[in-house]
Amino acid sequence: MDRALVHTSRLVLRLSVFVVALCIAAPAGAAPSTSVASRTPLRAGAHGSAVRTLQLALAWHGFPSGTIDGSFGPQLAGAVRRFQRAAGLRVDGVAGPTTLALLRKAPRRAAIPLGWPLLAPVGDPFGPRGDRFHGGVDLLAAAGTPVLAAAPGRVTWAGPRAGGWGNLVTIAHQNGVRTLYAHLSIIRVHVGEWLAGGALIGRVGSTGDATGPHLHFEVRVHGAAIDPLSALVTLGPGT
């Protein structure tokens, strides 16, 4: 039964690819809606709009610091250090000229093509959500809808996970790319398993911190969350 449903899902993905691209995919290389305007170094203890903009810019680059409140506390200093480490900069937790200049550049994109895990409208996109930052996209689909691997890779997590994820599958791909599939009702893979792109990994559910059935989908590059829609513009069903 699962095999037949997966075959049908792949056909639908191939037939609907251009419609989805026109309706919900972000344009390639889309830049975040905010940039760091400050030229003055920002450090622990700072407050105000420049700090809030720094928090947003770091989140867009995949290094969220918790609540976006315009206050430079320990969490923000930690996010700055993680960004500096990933960028090969001196790690000091201070957003100086070089750090700020790199944050003005467009966020990184996935270095491999990714396919849609399922075809569905986007509920919550990647980006600010009130005073928090949503690190993935929510794809709205009926409970039980098949969820497919976005690319070939090895399963690194398959099971319940605390923190609101519910039933979660994570897959490690090439070039430091990792994909995450949360709130699943059923998981069909196990840790260590090698998957082809488009393989069935589970089914849509509402486990964990979810108010209704949907797939929370994340893409991370060397640990930094990126906008999944920018990574999915190729739209092949698990290339």
Question: What is each of the regions a protein language model found here?
Answer:
Residues 169-173, 193-239:
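Conserved, short, structured surface segments that act as functional micro-motifs
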Residues 2-15, 22-70:
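Acidic, Ser/Thr/Pro/Gly-enriched interdomain connector segments
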Residues 41-52, 56-101, 208-210:
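Short acidic, glycine/serine/threonine-rich helix-capping segments at coil-helix boundaries
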Residues 134, 150-188, 213-218:
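Zn2+-dependent peptidoglycan hydrolase active-site motif and core
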Residues 105-166, 197, 206, 210, ...:
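Surface-exposed, glycine-biased beta-strand/turn segments
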Residues 141, 150, 184, 189-190, ...:
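Surface-exposed strand-loop junctions at beta-sheet edges and helix termini
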Residues 33-40, 97-119, 134, 234-239:
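Intrinsically disordered, low-complexity Ser/Thr-rich linker and spacer segments
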